């Protein structure tokens, strides 16, 4: 069969060489990320659900006066304002002082902060929180990472595809997909997901260069540089703060590396397409594997300061134990929720206060838009007709097959099929993960790559029969999608049928139908033959198929903007933890103490972690990982803790926890009262009569102490005792604490779950209690080792580059002298 030439892409920037045109595309992606969060960039809004605080004491009492336009919460994303903001505020405050906060004294009577994977204290890009106000940094971090996602996805797709419009379409589909948009304010999810396309881009660029032709070989030193940078990006995925998402990044990379190890001898139709006719260099799979292992080692070593402490805490946490299916069954991606791939708001939206899905909206968000789904059709048609259509690149079919297979595997993980158990038994720690639907990250990325392959297939000139097959398949798929949607409406959503023409549901269906029809018509027009009679140097007309192809990424962007742009609250900065009389009273108390917050309902109390933003310490907390020993102790005092429904505020065990104040909402009376009511305003503050001091000796004498930093407590013993005595310190027990008495290493042991004890020799004057666990020491050592490996690779690559430049310079000089000699003769 005669081989057909591809449709030439329009020369919109015909006067520019290749890289400036790529730069223009990347600039457009950055502009889109700015538009998506324009209120943050241009209006100074904060990307935080700060209005949730206006429903909680003590801020609730001042909401009407300070924010008269406030009527209801925009989108109740509690974890962002309850967890992420206090953690970022705490870490950035101490990093500005030159201290890495390894311990957090503000939650759970003290807990390991570095082992809280979402603290991300080693993640370099979190320095932005230290350079500007934390509440503003949330928005700018999102803009930066959203732009990085778009640019790196575009770069990766340019490596594996020939056409810029295809790469642009895939980049837009992924950077604004449902997963990224829904988790945008959860910084650890966003930051970790960013390194998926970055790692694949560096890896693929390295492999493409290395597997190029013998006339332009890549020196082995530069291959090592590429693999080292790949490992560095994989390590960043571990440092960014969410190990589950990081694991999905690593799974995707591992699968793709295995695929490329098999196909490394073939040239993908990207930037080396013009050299594809020259024979490629032979490769040894073993040598290729060894260099991939180098990248994996560097990635593990770079991320070691984060994942080693997390694994240590996991061993002691409430999640330790056997895998329990019932604990994650409700968080799976159900068959019915696949309808949200077509209509993202099929089950409503929290912003509209009408969500009725089976689980959390954010956990199940993963749409890339119906237009992107339609673009799968030409890619799959080209895959299944690869023998009939002898296209220019057989490897493009291999790529399509790989990403289709990865998408199906990801779906099986998200939907808790039996394949999920394979990962549970083969990957350490996988059984303790929650939220299987978070595999939507891999689903969305695979779907975006398939959409890009679809655009590539649309622009490939094929014979009339293949084009007709594509048109038929597109119409059939569009009909099937419409049928599936109608079945879902009839059996699941009776609300769609009430007030038929004016209901919320019908508006969503109308949006779906519009993009479906426009997408089908645009794809049909793009797949036609070009109208410039094959003259590649003639600028196509505005209505030509090649020019219309650039409307595909525009259509994908418009659809995703319509679905997702309004989801994330962008609010006034003044709402974020503003001062009140009660918070000022607590902050002005010079003593060291802990507090207990109680209430009557989920919103009518001072939630755990919020006090951390005020610099106060509490015995409860909110985190996915905390030690089971402390959880057992706290639940012995109050079953179900941490909770607002606390009725054991008179328990003597609170004395051991150094609880000085009990905080209750203003409309809540406590009988009997836990202590003296000293303030009755926007909070009711009770002072308990006899809390034990934080540090004391055997005879009960309180010791003076202060935190030098979160990792270092200094205790002044004062008047020495006639003989040895014991120092008792109220702190949740955790491995990694060391005590130094007058400069000599002492022995610190646990007396109970919440009290640690050290022997003080007679005449002791000072004790320093320091938190520096072995997991952190080992992790930092491995990170330094990885830094050395990367530096050595870069130095080797630079020497190779200098040597190459020198040889080229010598060759040019020799050639010039020969030409001069020949001219003189």
Range-by-range predicted roles:
Residues 1-2, 7, 11, 22, ...:
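Contiguous transmembrane helix-bundle modules in multi-pass membrane proteins
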Residues 29-32, 148-160, 164-207, 222-262, ...:
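Membrane-embedded helix bundles of polyisoprenyl
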Residues 34-43, 95, 99, 116, ...:
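Membrane-interface helix-loop junctions at the exits of transmembrane helices
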Residues 40-160, 165-195, 333-363:
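Active-site lumenal/periplasmic loops and adjacent helix-entry segments of GT-C-fold
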Residues 53-93, 99, 296-382, 432, ...:
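Periplasmic/ER-lumenal interhelical loops and adjacent helix-loop junctions
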Residues 248-299, 383-392, 461, 531:
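Perimembrane helix-loop-helix junctions
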Residues 328, 558-701, 710-714, 718-723, ...:
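Extracytoplasmic
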Residues 374, 620, 678-681, 689-806, ...:
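Active-site-proximal, structured, solvent-exposed surfaces of multi-pass membrane proteins
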